[in-house]
């Protein structure tokens, strides 16, 4: 189970989500947790902005505790706005500020409706296909164990989000990184609470890489079968003509 400070963080993030408005599209691990059933703890908020205006802080001023927050800007540029909110949370290691990251890199794709999102309970959230695509790209391009865990979750719960090339790329990354090494890193992060699961059952994540590869193999075969059925030539039915012969 999560600690009290983590539960408070989850509640605060939900409150903030209902203040940000329609210009910001929710994405990332926390979006997966809140709206698509991910069972691990995620502590940050990530958004894509539709317009050039990436100032989300104005939207947060209506929060009942805003006057008690300390806000620290980490980065402001044409394509990024990163800041933290110190709302008084503490962990055994010290202060526990909330990180918020807004990106403007996808605004043209969003305006052209090339990235699908929906409004769920008043919050604009990327569709699962888009989040899965982003998570796949993250897993392939960086070495964070949470991406490894999330890919396994997505393959299990949302297999429709992956085509054959996606499956090949993920399998290649696991083989390149080493299945045993990935398993050890995942178990270590769970044991040291760097990666928090709702049910901390080490047995469930043992051989996690092998489970992913087995699932990939099954999904790949299913896609192959579907492709064969789709492209199977249709036989024209013979019919009898007026003279009793076989028509063409």
Task: Provide a role label for each language-model segment.
Residues 1-24, 37-40, 49-52, 56-248:
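Structured mid-to-C-terminal alpha-helical surface segments
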Residues 46:
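Acidic Asp/Glu-based divalent-cation binding sites
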Residues 26-31:
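Glycine-rich beta-strand-to-loop/alpha-helix junction loops that act as flexible
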């Amino acid at each position: 189970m999560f600690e009290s400070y983590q539960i408070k963080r989850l509640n605060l993030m939900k409150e903030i989500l209902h203040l940000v408005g329609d210009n910001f599209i929710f994405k990332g691990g926390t979006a997966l947790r809140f709206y698509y059933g991910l069972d691990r703890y995620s502590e940050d908020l990530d958004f894509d902005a539709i317009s050039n205006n990436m100032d989300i802080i104005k939207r947060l001023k209506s929060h009942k505790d805003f006057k008690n927050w300390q806000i620290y800007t980490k980065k402001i540029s044409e394509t990024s706005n990163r800041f933290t909110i110190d709302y008084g949370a503490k962990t055994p290691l010290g202060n526990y500020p909330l990180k918020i990251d807004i990106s403007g890199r996808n605004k043209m794709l969003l305006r052209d409706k090339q990235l699908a999102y929906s409004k769920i309970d008043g919050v604009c959230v990327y569709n699962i296909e888009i989040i899965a695509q982003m998570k796949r790209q993250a897993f392939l391009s960086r070495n964070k164990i949470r991406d490894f865990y999330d890919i396994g979750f997505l393959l299990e719960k949302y297999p429709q989000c992956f085509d054959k090339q996606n499956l090949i790329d993920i399998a290649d990354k696991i083989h390149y990184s080493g299945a045993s090494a990935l398993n050890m890193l995942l178990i270590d992060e769970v044991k040291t609470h760097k990666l928090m699961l709702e049910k901390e059952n080490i047995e469930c994540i043992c051989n996690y890489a092998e489970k992913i590869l087995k699932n990939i193999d099954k999904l790949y075969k299913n896609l192959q079968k579907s492709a064969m059925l789709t492209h199977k030539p249709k036989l024209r039915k013979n019919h009898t003509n007026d003279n009793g012969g076989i028509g063409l």
